[in-house]
């Protein structure tokens, strides 16, 4: 059975960029998302994540908040300030307090997933974020209906 066979109904394969300095979390997230049919890009630092986002333009970015050198807040700020990556939806996954998570949302994240996460719940949450962002982008790109020309 292929990995795509495990995808939730109505959800095509998406590219998800995961940015986390913890190699165990990075590999766990990668395995879970691949098992649900997604293409996963891995970035062990914020800087690598930003470079991958610019080059690959994933459908969704998952970013950890607590990382050395460049934390999640700085990563989100850089992504949202860049014309190439500005529209890519970003979800924070963090063990931070609710106040910190809210700062990430105010900085541009569309939401957050608390750590530690349940392996059975994470793919469903990612699917919900993808469905919401795909629906929003479809509404934004659908041209308005043209009215038939009227005779003078």
Regions found by a protein language model. Name each.
Residues 74, 96-114, 124, 128:
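Alpha4 helix (beta4-alpha4-beta5 surface) of REC/receiver domains from two-component response regulators
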Residues 67:
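Receiver (REC) domain active-site loop signature in two-component systems and cognate sites
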Residues 44-48, 71-77:
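Acidic catalytic/metal-coordinating carboxylates
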Residues 27-35:
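Charged docking surfaces used in two-component/phosphorelay signaling
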Residues 1-15, 120-152:
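Non-catalytic signal-transmission and effector/linker regions of two-component phosphorelay proteins
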Residues 64:
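Active-site residues of response regulator receiver
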Residues 37-44, 52:
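Short hydrophobic/Thr-rich beta-strand motif most characteristic of the beta2 strand and flanking loop
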